[in-house]
Amino acid sequence: MTTPLRTLLAAAFAMAIIAPTVQAAAPMVKSQAPGYYRLMVGDVEVTPINDGTVDLPMDQLLKQNADTTRATLGKNFLKVPTETSDNAFLINTGSKLVLVDTGAGTLFGPTLGKLVANLKAAGYQPDQVDEIYITHMHPDHVGGLASEGKAVFANAVVRAGKADADFWLSQANLDKAPADKKGSFQGAMASLNPYVKAGKFKAIEKDGELVPGITALAAPGHTPGHTIYVVQSRGQKLVLVGDLIHVAAVQMDNPQVTIGFDSDEKAASAARRKQFDAAAKEGELVGGAHLQFPGLGHLVTQGKGYKWVPVNYTQVR
């Protein structure tokens, strides 16, 4: 065999070995992991559940100079529109399974509505939920309650602040609402209606304990009956603040900045300051509906605002 022929055969043999490796390149999956996280608050198991994300024009929504908003977001490696988490929180007290907020369901498009799938991935079923506590009746918090006119959580009692129920479930308010606001009323009514008809909706009329270890506190401003929920066990505390904050990159440094979704901007700002001052002073764990998933962390007073310290990823012990 001549030398050139030996060289050609060797090259062909080498290519035969390499070729399968090249052809076996795996396709990209391009999907996110199931959106749930787990931690213990004393003896209570808390599972943040992500309903998905939605892109929002925060430079237009936040009540400050748009250029300032864009610059601040940029410094935090964010852009506009800003991808914003929509989080709910599942609380297992050992005797009750409680869900705080339900995500958007089908009311906000295909990037949301993942709560039930993620709840199941977390090891639970909708029929196991005993109680649902709504922070407020905006569509991205109540939309997951119903699907095609039927209750998604067949065995659950739903609770929300009375002022929110009186406002959002009022036909008179729907009738006189501006055209661009009617959808919020209609979404709330459609979402709550199966539970109202079944006698499974109960308004929260005053601050107090709803089940052992979970307390409701009125924090109006974002909506008339916006409510926060405090989980306590063995000296540990988690405060679920709902929509007291939307954009940590902006509103932690400047807590006076409000958002266009607030029904009463002055009251919303005051509620944020009150609860955040307390959380920073006491070192309380905070959970937010629109803080980047899992939406959990601590507040440290810094200048005229706060520093957000996200929770450290930990094993459940």
Where are the model-predicted features located?
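Active-site metal-binding motif and surrounding structural segment of the metallo-beta-lactamase
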Residues: S85-A88, G94, G109-R159
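Histidine-centered catalytic micro-motifs
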Residues: I132-V142, A219-H226, G287-P294
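Conserved beta-strand hairpin/beta-sheet module of binuclear metal-dependent hydrolase folds
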Residues: Q32-A122, I228-I245
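Gram-negative bacterial Sec-dependent N-terminal signal peptides
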Residues: M1-Q23
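Active-site metal-binding loops of divalent metal-dependent hydrolases
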Residues: D51-G52, T102-G105, M137, A163-D164, ...
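Metallo-beta-lactamase
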Residues: A26, G113, K120-Y124, Q128, ...
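Cap/insert and terminal regions of metallo-dependent hydrolase folds
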Residues: G109, V230, R234-R317
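Cleaved targeting-peptide boundary
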Residues: A24-K30
